Amino acid sequence: MASIEAALAEIKRGVEELIPEEELIAKLKEGRPLRIKLGADPTAPDIHLGHTVILNKLRAFQDLGHDVTFLIGDFTGMVGDPTGKNSTRPPLTREDVLRNAETYKQQVFKILDPAKTKIQFNSEWLSELGAEGMIRLAANQTVARMLERDDFKKRYAGGQPIAIHEFMYPLLQGYDSVAMETDVELGGTDQKFNLLMGRELQKANGQKPQVVLMMPLLVGLDGEKKMSKSANNYIGVSEAPSEMFGKIMSISDDLMWSYYELLSFRPLEELAQFKADVAAGKNPRDIKVLLAKEIIARFHSEADADAAEQEFVNRFAKNQIPDEMPEFTFAAGTPMANLLKEAELCSSTSEAMRMVKQGAAKMDGEKVEDAKAEPAVGTYVFQVGKRKFARITIA
C-alpha cells in the first residue's frame, strides 16, 4: 500500500466533501484493506460520463489495495430513490431491474478491475428483513428527521404527496452499510442525507461508523447543468468514438480542467504541468485532445481513439477553422436559421435559409440540412461560406 499521505492525496482528488477526514486517516493507519462500497440502483440501462466520476474514485481505492464492492440496489431499485425528485418515482419491476443490472455490470468493468471487484445485490439481506425487521428499521428515525431532507421538505410545503415507502429508502440504503460493515461509502453530493443515514444506523448497531466520501456532480456539455440524459448534455460511455471525441472537444477550456480532475487517471503532477503549459502559451486544444483520447481508449480502444482524432482532424483542420471566433449562447429550441442570423453569420433568416439550401452552412464541419432544425444542447462551430465562423453554445 502507498504511504498514508500519498494515499490520502489520491483519495481526496476531486472530492467535494469528506466526513470526517480524521476518521479516514485513523482507518488508513490500521494498515488493513478497508471495505469500500458504492451502491447504484439500476434504474436505467446505460451510464454516461457523469456516472463514471464515482466509479473512477472506486478504482482509485482498488489501486490502493482496498476491498471494493459495487452494490447493485436490486431491492432499493424497486422502491425508487426520491433524491431530488418532486414526485414519487414509478416503481420498476424486478425484470427491469435485473436487465438493467446486467448492462451496468458490463459497463462498470470498463473502469473497475473485475478481478478486484465484488458484486453484490442488496436483496440478499433486505429481502430477509421481513415485516418485523422493517418495523425495527423504521423505528430508528422520525418523520420530522425525514422532513429535514430538502426534497421532502419542498414537497411537503407544496402539498405534494410523499409515499410512506419513500421515507424507507434512506433507511434501506443505510442498512446496506450495516449489513456490509462498510468502512467507506462513496456517493454524489446529492446523496448526502442517505450516506449519513448509514453512519447513524451503524452507530445504532454497535459498529464503527463509515466515512462518507462525496464526489461533485459532473457539469454537462452546456457548462451549466449537471450531466444528465434529461438535459441532453451528456456523453454516453457506449457512444461511438467519433461522437465522444467531438463532444469532448466541444467543452469550454475552463470546463476541461474539471473533466481532467474528475475523469482522468493522469497523475496530479502531470495535470499541474498541463496547466503550466497552457499558462505559458500552449493551445488548450492540444491538451483537450489528450483528454478525449484517454477517455475513448478507456471505453473503446487506443486504436479507436487514434481513429477518432484523425477523423476530427480531417473534418475540422482541413476546413481551416480559426482558433479565435465570435462566441454566442442561445436557448435550446432556437431554429438553425435564427441562430445563423443572431450570430451575425447571415444578415437575415431569409439569407440563412438560402445558405442552408445552397449547402453553404455547416455545423461542426457537417452541412446543415434543415434550416428549421433545432440543435441539441452543446457547443458547436458554425460556418457560413469560407470565412464566417462562430462558436455557438445551446443551453
From Swiss-Prot:
One biological-process term from Gene Ontology? tyrosyl-tRNA aminoacylation
Where do the annotations place ATP binding?
K229
Gene3D superfamilies from the xrefs? HUPs, RNA-binding S4 domain, Tyrosyl-Transfer RNA Synthetase
Q: Where in the cell is it found?
A: Cytoplasm
Class in the EC hierarchy, top level: ligase
Show the catalytic activity: tRNA(Tyr) + L-tyrosine + ATP = L-tyrosyl-tRNA(Tyr) + AMP + diphosphate + H(+)
Quote the cellular component terms of the Gene Ontology held in the record: cytosol
Q: Domain named S4 RNA-binding: which ranges?
A: 334-394
> E.C. number, please?
6.1.1.1
**rRNA-binding found in the keyword field:** no
Q: Name one GO molecular function term.
A: tyrosine-tRNA ligase activity
- Keyword ATP-binding assigned to the entry: answer is yes
InterPro entries, alphabetically?
A: aa-tRNA-synth_I_CS, aa-tRNA-synth_Ic, Rossmann-like_a/b/a_fold, S4_RNA-bd_sf, Tyr-tRNA-ligase, Tyr-tRNA-ligase_bac-type, Tyr-tRNA-ligase_bac_2
- Motif 'KMSKS' region, per the record, lies over 226-230
Subunit notes for this chain? Homodimer.
Q: What is this protein called?
A: Tyrosine--tRNA ligase 2
Can you name the source organism? Vibrio vulnificus (strain YJ016)
